[in-house]
Amino acid sequence: METFLFTSESVNEGHPDKLCDQISDAVLDACLTQDPDSKVACETCTKTNMVMVFGEITTKADVDYEQIVRKTCREIGFISDDVGLDADHCKVLVNIEQQSPDIAQGVHGHFTKRPEEIGAGYQGHMFGYATDETPELMPLTHVLATKLGAKLTEVRKNGTCAWLRPDGKTQVTIEYRNDGGAMVPERVHTVLISTQHDETVTNDQIAADLKQHVIKPVIPEKYLDENTIFHLNPSGRFVIGGPHGDAGLTGRKIIIDTYGGWGAHGGGAFSGKDPTKVDRSGAYIVRQAAKSIVAAGLARRCLVQVSYAIGVPEPLSVFVDSYGTGTIPDKVILELIKKNFDFRPGMITINLDLKRGGNGRFQKTAAYGHFGRDDPDFTWEIVKPLKQEKALPA
């Protein structure tokens, strides 16, 4: 039986790039909560003792950017210089301007256009992917790497492993079998965890605690065997972390945000962007399309691409690849997708309810993945029943 290895990684909410993603989306949430028509393009960067938010925002909302920055950092656990950043005493810089009027008139006619007329906020192409290897219809490498990171944060915050600090990375390598284009996980080959820790803990305790409290609850026993390799803090020391260890920037973890290297990626980041930015809304709708195809049993794997021109509502192209796993031809799947999904940005916004902020809705997406999440705020994860005008060919 021929197999191959594939690897996906994840990073914790305390990783400096992910800190920036969460701040950018916390700003988006604050704007949308007060003004659902806010136009937001918010970037964040951070380094030792400093966080800066900058970009273009047009909103009627009254937003205290500094308060959002400090609150987000505090909730993640950056409460002293020892852990990499002090939320209450770091410098917060703000440089926010209004959206360019040239972009505004082209995209939404300065709010005069009907939803179906709203153009894409930018050009680009986005991909959605789904696979039947997990209940989430997501790649297992990505699911496990992401869940390991989330579990690290859980046992840090609940005190199970009090030596943990906010920053950390995880990575999982799985041995797969190709079953006619579908991916079948056989076993976990390697587990890698590098986590920030305090000065007092020993490497032996780190390894023991990670195996007992993080790996064991997350990775199903059937995937582990005597040959599974564990690299647990292989560098030997990870005390300095967060923005003190590395600079952070919004939009630098786009593969972690999506499918862990599976499928494809158009290159656009998500966080800090309102739904007129098709980098985000376009990627959400094609995930729903791909997931709905796999959930309907029409393919075991599915990739959907959509592309846009700035100011133009209709997509330039829609593409489907079932990797040879389709029960019907790809061209029939494509027609089914076109009939059931409206890819115009204004209609995506309505159908997925993307103007609704609050409840930390978009901030939640900014750590531990935008897809495969069981949360009613993740409306793009809802499987859509596919209406067929005529019986599908056998």
From Swiss-Prot:
Q: Name one Pfam family in it.
A: S-AdoMet_synt_N
Q: Which gene encodes it?
A: METK3
Name the domain of life this protein comes from: Eukaryota
Q: Where in the cell is it found?
A: Cytoplasm
Which pathway does the database say it acts in? Amino-acid biosynthesis; S-adenosyl-L-methionine biosynthesis; S-adenosyl-L-methionine from L-methionine: step 1/1
Record: residues binding ATP: H15, D167, G168, K169, S235, G236, R237, F238, D246, R252, K253, A269, K273, K277
Provide the protein name: S-adenosylmethionine synthase 3
Q: How is the cofactor bound?
A: Binds 2 divalent ions per subunit. The metal ions interact primarily with the substrate. Can utilize magnesium, manganese or cobalt (in vitro). Binds 1 potassium ion per subunit. The potassium ion interacts primarily with the substrate.
Q: What InterPro entries does this protein's entry cite?
A: ADOMET_SYNTHASE_CS (IPR022631), S-AdoMet_synt_C (IPR022630), S-AdoMet_synt_central (IPR022629), S-AdoMet_synt_N (IPR022628), S-AdoMet_synthetase (IPR002133), S-AdoMet_synthetase_sfam (IPR022636)
* Binding residue positions for L-methionine: E56, Q99, D246, K277
As cofactor, the record names: Mn(2+); Mg(2+); Co(2+); K(+)
